[in-house]
Every structure is written in structure tokens, then in C-alpha cells.
């Protein structure tokens, strides 16, 4: 089940591809205006990036409306959008079992109060190492994780690109290495990881 907004410039064949894979796109709104656009420059080792341009497009005026048939979903993945919108989505869902949220430097810098409010309502925060340090003001990984959990989430997943990811939950710590692949463009890799993480948890039912 997908909820979001795109502009009329968004290719319909991509929507049909998602539908063809069993994704219910009834929550996808097509609005007048351009689709969200981001540009960035990656370091040579692809482990960090500099945002060059963030154009919200139709996201700037997006008011998410969750279809009634979506509202009882047990698992919610709050994708990387404005924290105010993530909260608006969460307000419309009925008692989910697990809420996972993603965020990025743009929102940490520009919408921190709303982000801090959101973090008190999510179960799992998925965030990359650089942004975790930015959000917490800490550097050492143990201190970073402790601060993240103090902000609200029960679990923090800190992504480290080609080095895998760390999961922190209370006194539990788990490290998962990455499969080494030739990276062509890492844009969206973190979001795909977060979605795959929640998809597996939902399928496992644990």
C-alpha cells in the first residue's frame, strides 16, 4: 500500500510497474506541479554526499489523505518526507503494530522541532551514520545510538553504506554486514533498505 504525491510529470509507466508488482497505489495523488526533485554530489567512496538542490514541488502543498482501507495496516513505513507530513500520516492510522521512520539532513536542519515530535511516536528510526551524528550532536557510535533512543524510538538502525548497518535496541546491539556490490548510483539505497527491513519484519511477523 503506497501513499504519496507526484506531479503530472511523473511517468505513469512507473506507477503501472508498481501496480504490476502487487502494490496498491490508491493512496498515490497526482497533483498539478512538478514532482519532488533532489540533486546531490557523492564522495569518491560513495559513503557521504552533499545536497546541491532540493525542490519540494508538489510536496510543498501535500495534505496526505489515507484511504480508509489503508488505515488498519499493522505496519507503517514513514518515508523520507517532511516530518509534519509523516505525523499527518501517522495521525490517520489506527493502532499500528510497528512504525518505522526515515529522515535526512534537509529535515534535520529545516524541521527539527517537528522531527523531534515525530521521534517520540515511532518504534524504529532508520538513519545513516552522518545524519545520526548531525541529529544527536554526538560522534562515537555508542553515544549516538544512546541519544537516538533517548529521543523516542525503541530501536535505531544506523546505516553505514558498504559497511552494513548497526541495530540498537535497549541493551541489544546487532551488526549486519553488507553484500559487496559494484555501486552505480546509491541514490535511494537507504530508503530501499528501510523498506526491505520493514517488509521482512512484516513477513516474519516478529
Regions found by a protein language model. Give the residues of each.
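A structural micro-motif
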Residues: 23-26, 96-98, 122, 154, ...
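Conserved N-terminal subdomain of the carbohydrate kinase-like
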Residues: 2-77, 91-96
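Acidic, amphipathic alpha-helical patches
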Residues: 66, 115, 183
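Structured loop/turn residues at beta-strand edges in well-structured enzyme cores
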Residues: 71, 120, 151
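Conserved phosphate-binding/catalytic region of the ribokinase-like
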Residues: 139-206
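Structural beta-sheet core signal
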Residues: 2-4, 101, 158
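Short, acidic/turn-prone active-site loops that include or flank metal/cofactor-
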Residues: 30-32, 103-107, 130, 179-182
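Conserved beta-alpha-beta core of the PfkB/ribokinase-like small-molecule kinase fold
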Residues: 75-146, 164-165
Amino acid at each position: 500500500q503506497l501513499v504519496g504525491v507526484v506531479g503530472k510529470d511523473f511517468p505513469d509507466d512507473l506507477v503501472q510497474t508498481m501496480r504490476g508488482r502487487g502494490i496498491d497505489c490508491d493512496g498515490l495523488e497526482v497533483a498539478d506541479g512538478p514532482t519532488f526533485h533532489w540533486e546531490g554530489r557523492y564522495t569518491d567512496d560513495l559513503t557521504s554526499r552533499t545536497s546541491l538542490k532540493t525542490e519540494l514541488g508538489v510536496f510543498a502543498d501535500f495534505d496526505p489523505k489515507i484511504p480508509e482501507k489503508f488505515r488498519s495496516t499493522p505496519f507503517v513505513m514513514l518515508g523520507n518526507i517532511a516530518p509534519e507530513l509523516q505525523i499527518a500520516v501517522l495521525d490517520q492510522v489506527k493502532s499500528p503494530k510497528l512504525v518505522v521512520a526515515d529522515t535526512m539532513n534537509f529535515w534535520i536542519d529545516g524541521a527539527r522541532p517537528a522531527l523531534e515530535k515525530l521521534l517520540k511516536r515511532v518504534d524504529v528510526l532508520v538513519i545513516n551514520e552522518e545524519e545520526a551524528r548531525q541529529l544527536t550532536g554526538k560522534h562515537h557510535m555508542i553515544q549516538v545510538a544512546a541519544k537516538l533512543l533517548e529521543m523516542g524510538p525503541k530501536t535505531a538502525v544506523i546505516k553505514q553504506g558498504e559497511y552494513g548497518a548497526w541495530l540498537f535496541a535497549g541493551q541489544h546491539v546487532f551488526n549486519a554486514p553488507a553484500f559487496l556490490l559494484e555501486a552505480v548510483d546509491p541514490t535511494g539505497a537507504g530508503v530501499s533498505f528501510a523498506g526491505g527491513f520493514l517488509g521482512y519484519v512484516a513477513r516474519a511477523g516478529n
